[in-house]
């Protein structure tokens, strides 16, 4: 089940100090939110991108709604550069790609193709976008959305393959060395509970999968931030050159596998769950987004977006700054730390407008 991200539940604002005017901070220690106003850029080339990211001087988008799969735009003005790789099963085609996270400053990026068990690196060569490297995945763990460190180490999530109705499907956080093929280096059990239900009806097989506390990953340098949204925990790892994941710190309440496994996933009202999302990591900061929706009446799925807030922390989870985006409906947000900009768009529409925000920390 895909859960919507509705807002932080925070206590009332607290005044700082007993004397003097002082700016008020909320219960978490954030100063009042700064409202950011957007510039708008029209986009015509791509329809409904499934994935996107910032890679050096480029924004890269992947779409399965067009004949070409990969689109690049030069930042910060979103000047269209090229569309590449036809949708198909040929050696120079892409069936469908999942963009991997990386902070490569040279503009190269990685795409995973689980159907063919491939990881591919793309970048400029001879004046055009080309495939630079292919890594085969000979392991039993398919790669969908992962984080790549220095083009050598990949970290991704993997769920155990099970059949039937299972109350607790294990989720693993795994690291792989990237040679000619992937090789498993390290694997950790995630603080996640997944419930799987399978049944047969009218000669058809059905399955529903619901996850409580699914991890969200962002990498920068040799650090990996892992955000557990339902328990509000941030785990920070150092990833060694050998691919070993070394836990540096856990932020938030006590986290244990017993605590997670005791949760009754089937009883959770997901429509009223308040979960922020980890959207970016930079050298100094972590960015979390909270989207506020109008209450669902059970009949109309087109809830109104009431608020779109970005909270910025340092890597020790100290509050730094809070921003409100004026284009509330632009709920997909990418952070460009090199230029101190955020780019946002409304995923309910075709990719018609990009909203550009400048921010200061």
What are these language model-derived features?
Residues 16-18:
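C-terminal motif of bacterial Sec signal peptides marking the signal peptidase cleavage site
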Residues 24-47, 318:
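A short helix->beta-strand "capping" segment at the edge of beta-propeller domains
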Residues 39-41, 82-95, 132-139, 183-209, ...:
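Surface-exposed loop and turn segments in beta-propeller and other repeat-based domains
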Residues 39-70, 285-293:
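Beta-strand-rich domains and repeat architectures in extracellular enzymes and scaffolds
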Residues 46-53, 93-101, 139-150, 213-215, ...:
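Repeated scaffold domains used in trafficking and secretory/extracellular systems
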Residues 157-171, 288-305, 352-357:
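Short, conserved, GDST-rich strand-edge loop motifs in beta-rich repeat architectures
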Residues 169-181, 302-318, 356-361:
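Beta-propeller blade signature
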Residues 270-312:
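Loop/turn-rich, solvent-exposed surfaces of beta-rich toroidal or solenoidal domains
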